[in-house]
Amino acid sequence: MLAFTEVAYRGLLIEQDKRSAHRYVDSYEELKGKTLLDIGAAEAIFTLDTIEYIDHAYLFECDESWIEALEATFAPYKEKITIVRKYVSDVNDEDNITLDTFFRDEGKSIDNLFLKMNIEGYERIALEGAVHSLEHGRQIGGSVCIYHLHDDKKVIESELKKFNLKTSIQPGYLYFEKEMRSAIIRFWS
């Protein structure tokens, strides 16, 4: 019988299989030279898979149970990783930060970014806090989960198109909340 960790790991691998509706990119080559924002990082397997391609990654993760594991996992790459212990949102306070504020306060460029966003139904709120970055960032792209809320696909696609971003829906469906739903919308400038 497989141990829980083996089953969980296999699930993560299946999630990013080339045929999966939940796959974030067609090829990791797309991230070459990019700054990755892993929003809702959890175990950060996507960042780990792309670490050799990206310039830097910001891991946005608030769940303290992940922090020690993230620090250990990325110890060999500590110059390429920053763990941010805040929720990405449309407000700024002790626990939350908007992407626009994050980049302004850090003095970092909003160009050449890839946003991976899987935050359990808070994706549209996080996008509301990234208006400046999405409007003015050059060579910006990403993948956003669109299955957590019933109308995410329609609402999030509409929001992204307001910024003249091109979009595509990852083929396939997930069974979620007793419905077959598209899982990922990709966007790029």
What are these regions (language model features)?
Residues 115, 138-147:
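Conserved beta-strand signature within the Rossmann-like core of class I S-adenosyl-L-methionine
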Residues 1-60, 63-109, 153-154, 158, ...:
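S-adenosyl-L-methionine
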Residues 75-80, 107-108, 134-139, 162-166:
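Short helix-capping segments at alpha-helix termini
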Residues 60-68, 123, 148-151:
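Canonical radical SAM enzyme core domain
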Residues 49-53, 69-73, 126-133, 155-159:
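A short acidic, amphipathic alpha-helical/loop segment
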Residues 95-96, 102, 126-135:
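Intrinsically disordered, low-complexity segments enriched in Gly and acidic/Ser/Thr residues
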Residues 40, 116-120:
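Conserved S-adenosyl-L-methionine
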